[in-house]
Amino acid sequence: MRWVRAVFALVFCLSAGGRSGVAQKTQAPASATVTVSAGDLSAQPVGANWTSYNGDYSGRRYSTLNEITTANVSQLRAAWVFHPGNSQRLEVTPVVVRGIMYITSANDVFALDAGTGRDVWHYQRPVSSGLLDDAAAHKNRGVAVWQDSVYVETDDAHLLRLDARSGGLIWDVEYAEKSKHYGATSAPLAVKDEIIVGSSGGDSGVRGFVAAFDALTGKQKWRFWTIPGPGEFGSSSWPGQAYLYGGATTWMPGTYDPALNTVYWTTSNAAPDFVGDTRPGDDLYTACVLALDPDSGKLKWYFQFTPHDLYDYDANETPVLIDTREKGVTRRLLVQANRNGFFYVLDRTDGKFFGATPFVEKLNWAKKIDSSGRPVLSGRIPSAEGTYICPGIEGATNWFSPSYNPSTGLFYFMALESCNTYFAKARPFTQGETYYNTGTKRPPDEQSQKILLAYSVPERKLVWRYPQAGRGDSWGGTLTTAGGLLFFADDAGSLEAVDATNGQPLWHFNTGQRIDASPMSYAVDGMQYVSVAAGSDIFSFSLPH
């Protein structure tokens, strides 16, 4: 094992503020030299490879692998465990291409032999100081891969390009100013010849955006600001300088429809939280899904889930792309289980609203969603004395990943039954401080519960539910497979498998750690594996050899 300096494919660093990292390398297997093709990235659904955060562009987290089935999943056992060593709460979904797994932990990137868990190379970069909110916790959800390169966002909003063969740094681009308290927690998305990124910091008083960079050179190709500037459509919500710190950050990866050539990206809450006097109106484009042209960054359409959000109901949950046949008509849909407690169905070609139904029982901020897609409010808003509001600040669901199985026709996701008392007290924006006005508390007798839900999109109804034991404080998501299975991270620290048709429990493995990530599946030499980040470790499971 030897230490090497990062290998620079470009002789300059594109960011004057960039910090060099180092790559530690062991003997790499031959498959580490493969190139990730456009066909690999556009394959839908995925099989042996898992080429992006959600597996494929659609966001369905569905694997065609079927070696592991309802009949043999009880034999599943841990094949290997890898400990990155620098994070206690991993949130990464591994990416696997031809037997090589890429994971992140804080600002570090690892390449592993996906069959054994053996370390191939390790790129190290120090964590940043002086950050706020989620970025200060150095959370990172994974990488993007393109040709012979690996791309990662750092906690201080740099985009790095690494050599997939060695882990050497090729270039480093600062795409948002740390001095303004931008950060990043997401995995990038590779589309065509560009890498698309977002930012965190919506509760820290920043202006959100989605940006695309040339995958070869790192040069910015376009940037779409999610808070409109003066004179732009929607700017009436942002008087004076309010647009500069209005939030609408983009802290989860989007999805992409190659046939429509459209990227779908979601945005966070408006800032300040809980008090809306300084941001009258709908507060575009907060709590939205945006349909963007990946070639130009121009907005095609948008849909806002929670106009004038006072509850911290980010819309950053995955916008999943599915096709259904309803009444003899094939529909290209975008569906989302939203943090506000409603399940939305949209036409992804133009954003037309098809309907929204509640999926939790604890819901009192709105009475319903009307025929135009707007909420009919109940009048419950944060107050100085405190107001009991459901869902609570963590939402009826959150960023933990959903999945969709085309064989069952069911959409799976984790829901949270929980409420909070919301308090409001206006205060001015101060650079360098979080922009909460003011906060929430959980009532002493409030019992939160996670529930695994299966939802039929054509029928617009819940089909089955699987309540979880625990405190409702884990953040694990779901994976569904052609083996008739649904894997998910439960609230007790276990990876669990149930029958995707009816939710019947079939297998579980307790990791002994809280799971704040979502499972994925891949194959090496014809053998199927299921992998998940649990606590500070990566676990990979397979049937006995």
Predicted features along the sequence, with ranges:
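Blade-level signature of beta-propeller repeat domains, shared across WD40, Kelch, NHL, RCC1
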Residues: 517-545
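Extracytoplasmic beta-rich repeat domains
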Residues: 82-93, 122-144, 169-187, 204, ...
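Short coil/turn segments that connect the beta-strands within blades of beta-propeller domains
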Residues: 47-48, 98-100, 147-148, 192-194, ...
